[in-house]
Amino acid sequence: MSKNYLFTSESVSEGHPDKLADQISDAILDEILKQDKNARVACETLVKTGMALVAGEITTSAWVDIEELVRNVITETGYDNASKGIDGRTCSVINAIGKQSRDITQGVDRGSLEDLGAGDQGLMFGFATNETPTLMPSAIYYSHLLMRKQAELRKSGKLAWLRPDAKAQVTLAYENDKPKFIDTIVLSTQHNESISQKELHDAVIEEIVKKVIPNELITKDTKYHINPTGVFLIGGPQGDCGLTGRKIIVDTYGGAAHHGGGAFSGKDPSKVDRSGAYMGRYIAKNIVAAGLADKCEVQVAYAIGVAKPVSLMVNTFGTGKITDNQIEKLVAEVFDLRVGKIIENLDLLRPIYRKTSNYGHFGRELPEFTWEKIDKADILKSAARI
């Protein structure tokens, strides 16, 4: 890639149908983990007009009222009237959950957490860059801020015409590989019939965009596309079918890094799609926080039933203060990449996952998000002797 370029990422609101599905899957996971930390959960959700279908494989001693939980998530997300796309109080809830295959169970469970085998094969990536305060890429960072502001204004009632479904997209102009200004902002939000297009356009610019985007990133040439189709009345599951795991780029780095292909929501942490990706972020963030590189991507891969990873790779894109191979050796010394130790060290057997399902799994420094800590940075810096 040239040193001067445009780069774009998107985010979606918690009322986007795919995100509604993610929230349901993670809410079910959370409720099970409250009762049974040894549960095996792979929960998928589909939402469409007037219905929610929950399916997957769950092995647990816990009892969860799936129907009530699904209804609560839908209404809490703002879908409490059929005119919005679905009504959690009256929609149909279909439960098609089965148990995990015994063949998988015998290959994964080892008695002790330390010896736990990976729940499946797969490759995962972690990433960090010093572009933003949370060490996230700029385009996804600002896209998430726009969507969080939209939700805040909707929930507070300040913009009473807002409805739950929305999307944002930010295009950053880079010069010499550094973000310089925002070239384009796209924001589409569902609304009711009381607002005109001009009023909506002006309110979104003044109350959402200008409240979260730094002035220094906006130029006279910055382009705005606010509800560019003109009307966004039909949204949520009525407008589009929603499925768990359909927003994996929104969940991660907005396309600024590789992705191993595995989704997160609805999966307990024995599934390395989730725990391996969280560990990758933890490693990459600590490398950048330590000053070992300006930008870092980590790949880790696992075999089903095997505790240790089959591979580890570090790429600093030429920004490393020491070689990538040297950083890899430090990572192997400082971080325990066995699946059970990842779960233990990041304290992943807690009911924290519904919070992860909106506005990205990475870059939000909440107490529950242990993979966002930079507690290994000083250790890495000292070991690297920089």
From Swiss-Prot:
Mg(2+) binds at D18. InterPro entries: ADOMET_SYNTHASE_CS (IPR022631), S-AdoMet_synt_C (IPR022630), S-AdoMet_synt_central (IPR022629), S-AdoMet_synt_N (IPR022628), S-AdoMet_synthetase (IPR002133), S-AdoMet_synthetase_sfam (IPR022636). GO terms for cellular component: cytoplasm. GO terms for biological process: one-carbon metabolic process; S-adenosylmethionine biosynthetic process. It catalyses: L-methionine + ATP + H2O = S-adenosyl-L-methionine + phosphate + diphosphate. Residues 100-110 are annotated as: Flexible loop. L-methionine binds at E57, Q100, D240, K271. Keywords: ATP-binding, Cytoplasm, Magnesium, Metal-binding, Nucleotide-binding, One-carbon metabolism, Potassium, Transferase. The keyword Transferase applies. This is S-adenosylmethionine synthase. It comes from Francisella tularensis subsp. tularensis (strain SCHU S4 / Schu 4).
